[in-house]
Amino acid sequence: DSSVGGKTAVNLEAGKNLWGAFKQPILVLCDPATLNTLPDMEWINGCGEIIKYGFLDVPGLLTQLEHKPLIKHRDSISTVITRCVQAKADIVEQDERESGVRALLNLGHTFGHGIEKASHFEVHHGYAVAIGMMLMAQGAVKHGELDVEALEKLKVLIKAHDLPTTTTISKEEILAAAKHDKKSEGATIKIVVPTSYGHSELKVITHEELATYLD
């Protein structure tokens, strides 16, 4: 996933991906056969990002994942990779430097990065993104932006891929880390909110308002 889009970034003590640049690769080679060398934990880890794409208007992806969870149907990985890579490429072509629509790719990452940092990166990225999506979706329900049925379907899908939906990390720790997120500017932060099953939207809110998504 990170090979497509041209971002080159490093993690700092204050948070993830805070220092970087844009450099498009000459070639991206996707060889699904190499995934056979991965332990189950890393397969599950990758599914967090894949489920994210299902909420970015990728036609048919959620239905495919519902009927054939990747954990049990690994033979479908090539089709899934193709859909996700094409979706990201389409978004990046519209907004290479992330001044607009590309920020949608951060669904689940605001709270997810906070969880990673607060856990001292013991929680792997895909696991954190899954929890981050769930927390944001729960907040969206509280704010009247998402219906409960969509939230429950997301929860079922995440669990079907053996990913977590909750964390023992405190709200205060997550928010403290989120304030240093690269999408944070001054007193505001740009978040990605799921507004229906399969669709998400960008929203700029204050840090105080962000806290209400975790209440």
What are the residue ranges of the model-derived segments?
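C-terminal charged capping/lid subdomain of soluble metabolic enzymes
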Residues: 48-51, 145-215
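A glycine/threonine-rich phosphate-anchoring loop and its flanking beta-alpha core
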Residues: 1-68
